[in-house]
């Protein structure tokens, strides 16, 4: 919808605020000049499209707020850390229900979208429009509502399941449904939505939900809950659409020039200078180049990238500790700023803690020496405070790797043809061209697939955050010691900055200098304390 959404987002945003803030006021009985009541609104297809845009805008796939959550929860893993607020507490075992910075915004945004979707579905039949068009927009709204429940259930577990517009009294007495009930609802809704969604759209409708997106979210949810055979079948449905494909590019996928790629199945809808993105070209920018560098990539992620002979750094004869970034998987260079190696805008990236800060974020100097490069555009000249860069949520590479993992875990036969259709298709893109995988031993292949997901999707939609939880390795990886770039070969006598016994930088964040233990219960977020105060029927997650 990005091409058409620019024309209607502002109107829709204002309109939907006035229409849908009614959960706190008797707005149906009033019609001030700045608002519209239901009796004067649901009269035409144009009204429908405005309401639809308002739901897109409210949801997690439609805003810069989601980009912030990608930043935060991608940085709530063993890949990187986020410098600010409550997310850094996740590493230290002190994440609390009152840490509202991201816990509350996820909950509120999701239920705002769900309310808008319910309101839409209760009123759409009033509109006289083509039956096929009506079925399509209903499918879009059912998808958008189901996506919010998918996201809520992934972050919190069971949550209140609301499928109609509620009064304030009803809303404040809702109890949590079981996780299984939420998952069943989501799968049913996504299945129904996929039937009425088109496989493709004209360029003028780019950004509106497609059949592949509904199937991809469904497959991902099935995989999270280890329903492997169903997940494999659903992923195969997407493959058989013959709509999406692996882009030969990699770096450009995460820039504005890549937004039309056939690899992208679902992404945010960001519009420069209207509903812009402050993260890609400012907050993720290293301070060395004038940004805030709000993320700190850990050494463990850097080490996960293989050598370009396809072997880990511990096994490859190409690895040279004195030149650790030479001869690596090309995705490393596209994803991470590497100290004294990456050249960006004609300047060599330097990150030693002794350097005088050259950026605008003096208190925010990086704590590991490594910076987030994915999504940062070298030749960007626009407004860094409101760029138009979308953020990818699901792309076709995840479909292929998800299909392989689902086939592997369901016990199906693993053949070279299957590997070539999936993981080798991903690794073989022109810009990457890593050696093909030939391993068919299940245990060994499982580790290869997991590492491939880590490097292919690093620093994207919180894929790693979800993966380490569904693989049941969350506490294992989160309780390790994190560190950054190597500062010295003589750590036993080095006193300038805190280092590990290997001479690697420890920085200053809680994520690096642990003060607590991450517990298994921390795999789920706490229900926002503010919501429990309003609705005592809500039970808090264990451990909080």
Question: What role is predicted for each listed range?
Answer:
Residues 1-21:
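Sec-dependent bacterial lipoprotein signal peptides
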């Amino acid at each position: 919808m990005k091409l058409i959404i620019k024309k209607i987002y502002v109107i829709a945003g204002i309109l939907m605020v006035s229409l849908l803030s009614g959960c706190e006021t008797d707005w149906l009985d009033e019609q001030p000049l700045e608002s519209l009541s239901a009796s004067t609104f649901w009269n035409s297809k144009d009204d429908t499209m405005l309401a639809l845009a308002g739901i897109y805008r409210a949801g997690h796939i439609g805003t810069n707020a989601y980009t912030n959550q990608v930043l935060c929860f991608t940085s709530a893993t063993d890949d990187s850390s986020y410098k600010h607020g409550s997310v850094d507490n996740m590493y230290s075992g002190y994440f609390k229900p009152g840490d509202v910075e991201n816990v509350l915004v996820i909950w509120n945004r999701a239920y705002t979208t769900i309310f808008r979707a319910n309101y839409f579905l209760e009123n759409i039949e009033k509109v006289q429009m083509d039956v096929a068009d009506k079925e399509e927009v209903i499918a879009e709204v059912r998808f958008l509502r189901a996506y919010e429940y998918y996201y809520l259930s992934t972050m919190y577990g069971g949550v209140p399941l609301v499928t109609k517009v509620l009064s304030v009294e009803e809303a404040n007495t809702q109890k949590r449904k079981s996780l299984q009930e939420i998952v069943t609802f989501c799968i049913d809704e996504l299945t129904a939505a996929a039937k009425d969604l088109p496989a493709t759209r004209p360029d003028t409708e780019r950004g509106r939900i497609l059949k592949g997106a509904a199937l991809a979210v469904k497959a991902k949810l099935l995989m999270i809950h280890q329903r492997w055979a169903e997940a494999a079948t659903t992923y195969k449905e997407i493959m058989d659409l013959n709509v999406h494909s692996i882009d030969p590019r990699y770096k450009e996928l995460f820039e504005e020039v890549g937004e039309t790629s056939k690899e992208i199945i679902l992404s945010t809808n960001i519009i420069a200078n209207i509903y812009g993105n402050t993260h890609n070209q400012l907050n993720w920018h290293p301070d060395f180049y004038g940004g805030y560098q709000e993320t700190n990539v850990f050494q463990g992620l850097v080490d996960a990238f293989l050598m370009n002979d396809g072997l880990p750094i511990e096994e490859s004869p190409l690895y040279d500790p004195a030149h650790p970034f030479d001869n690596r998987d090309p995705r490393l260079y596209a994803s991470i700023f590497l100290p004294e190696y990456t050249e960006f805008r004609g300047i060599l990236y330097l990150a030693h803690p002794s350097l005088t800060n050259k950026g605008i974020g003096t208190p925010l100097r990086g704590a590991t020496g490594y910076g987030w490069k994915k999504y940062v555009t070298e030749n960007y000249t626009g407004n860094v405070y409101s760029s138009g860069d979308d953020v990818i949520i699901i792309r076709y590479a995840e479909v292929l790797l998800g299909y392989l993992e689902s086939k592997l875990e369901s016990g199906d036969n693993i053949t070279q043809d299957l590997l070539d259709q999936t993981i080798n298709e991903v690794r073989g893109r022109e810009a990457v061209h890593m050696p093909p995988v030939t391993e068919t031993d299940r245990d060994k292949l499982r580790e290869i697939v997991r590492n491939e997901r880590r490097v292919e999707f690093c620093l994207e939609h919180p894929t790693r955050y979800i993966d380490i939880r569904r693989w049941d390795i969350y506490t294992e990886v989160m309780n390790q010691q994190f560190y950054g770039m190597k500062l010295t070969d003589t750590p036993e006598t080095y006193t300038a900055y805190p280092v590990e016994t290997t001479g690697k930088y420890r920085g200053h964040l809680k994520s690096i200098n642990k003060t607590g233990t991450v517990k298994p219960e921390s795999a789920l977020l706490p229900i926002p304390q503010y919501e429990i105060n309003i609705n005592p029927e809500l039970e808090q997650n264990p451990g909080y």
